[in-house]
Amino acid sequence: MLEELRDIMARLRDPETGCPWDVEQDFRTIAPYTIEEAYEVADAIERDDMAALRDELGDLQLQVVFHARMAEEAGAFDLKDVLDSISAKMIRRHPHVFGDGASPGWEEIKAAERAGASEDGSALAGVASALPALLRAEKLQKRAARTGFDWPDPDGARDKVAEEIDEVRTAATDADRFEEMGDLLFAVVNWSRKLGIDPEAALRAANLKFEKRFRAMEDIAGEAFKGLSLEDKEALWVRVKRS
């Protein structure tokens, strides 16, 4: 089946007989679609929609095949190389399953892979700059924590959040407020991490809760909703929240 999808992509990318849109794409133009498809997979999982998950996984697989095809055209690698590479990586990272159970642990193996792939010896090496900011903040903090640079308990992280709130409040310029708001968001992610809470999952849940309540307000008020005063909307919000 994967071979069929690979052949379809080859035909779509054919300069003479393929699809003009597919032919003109490159890695950079396709990358946003790859990210979008990954989020749509996560959304289907969040909604527990198996039919949608099936379709979205297919769309995500298409992105892999698309990138692999472009790489093959450039003479860099092909789809088989991609599959061989991930298979070898999974075997290497699971010596307790595929080899000597006394082999190094997961983190040691990953650290060795990073060291072999880059001259950057930092503990933060390999944290992709293109990750969503919330996720990247958490990954950077986790990496730093492994070196011992971390709050000993959640209280220190909580106090840092309070400190950053004050700094946002007292910032003198827009540029200062921008910087301090970034520090505040970073601190909130850190506090969440210290409490054992996935900040991305927590924010997704908060988004869904807000959306559900706001839609309920719209349903109750109908077409009159937009014309309600802020006071009436706040009263409606409290009503929905209590229901």
For each of these PLM feature ranges, what is it?
Residues 1-57, 62-181, 185-243:
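Flexible "arm" and connector segments at domain edges
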